[in-house]
């Protein structure tokens, strides 16, 4: 069993309020949906955690990359100067 009195050397990290509790162990690449829950359901309903992109199947990731690249190219085309200036 755990000792009843915590080790004095390790100071407990102070967190204030619900917001700090909510974001305590949110890891990188993992988003928690901001759907508000009624307080009575809070203990029963787990937070909806969106999957990391890395855990998706490979082809889906490739599709995402293609989509993002296309979008980026389109936005770059708008800002690109014309190559040949008409004389």
Swiss-Prot record:
The keyword Nucleotidyltransferase does not apply. Its main location: nucleus. Keywords: Chromosome, Developmental protein, Differentiation, DNA-binding, Nucleosome core, Nucleus, Spermatogenesis. The keyword Ubl conjugation does not apply. GO terms for cellular component: nucleosome; nucleus. One of its GO terms (molecular function) is DNA binding. Transmembrane segments: none annotated. GO terms for biological process: cell differentiation; spermatogenesis. It is found in: Nucleus; Chromosome. Residues 1-36 are annotated as: Disordered. This is Spermatid-specific protein S1. It comes from Scyliorhinus canicula.
């Amino acid at each position: 069993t755990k000792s009843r009195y915590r080790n004095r050397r390790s100071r407990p990290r102070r967190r204030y309020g619900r917001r700090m509790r909510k974001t305590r162990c949110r890891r990188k690449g993992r988003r928690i949906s901001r759907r508000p829950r009624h307080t009575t359901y809070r203990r029963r309903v787990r937070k909806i955690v969106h999957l990391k992109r890395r855990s998706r199947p490979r082809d889906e990731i490739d599709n995402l990359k293609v989509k993002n690249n296309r979008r980026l190219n389109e936005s770059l085309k708008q800002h690109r100067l014309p190559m040949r200036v008409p004389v």
